[in-house]
Amino acid sequence: MTFDVDKTIKYWLDSAMYDLETGKSLLEIKRFPYALFLGHLALEKVLKALVVKTTKEHAPYTHALTLLAKKTKIEMPESIIDQLAEYTEFHIESRYPDEKMDFYKKSTDEFSNKKFKEIEDLYTWLIQKL
């Protein structure tokens, strides 16, 4: 079985865009924790597309954004790595019961809109690296 790099990159990017748009929709109806979770997924998938592009290999099975960033071999400012570390928490906190309720309380309108805007900006920055 051959590995089609371009097809795999397209798969990750199409899926990332869908997740980002769905996250925006959830933000509008005030489903804040899930909007942030999908924002995380969108970043994860763009990073996976970058991993495939730079390594010509399948992206690893992980949700850790900082690990994926490292695997892209793309120079990223420390501030972006810090953001990725923060957004990885959106995946964990929105899914696991011990963390879920605290995350729901933290996910206010102001917090969620600010973080989702940051995610969109980072998404755009990452897309430009393709």
Where are these regions (language model features)?
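Terminal alpha-helical segments
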Residues: 1-130
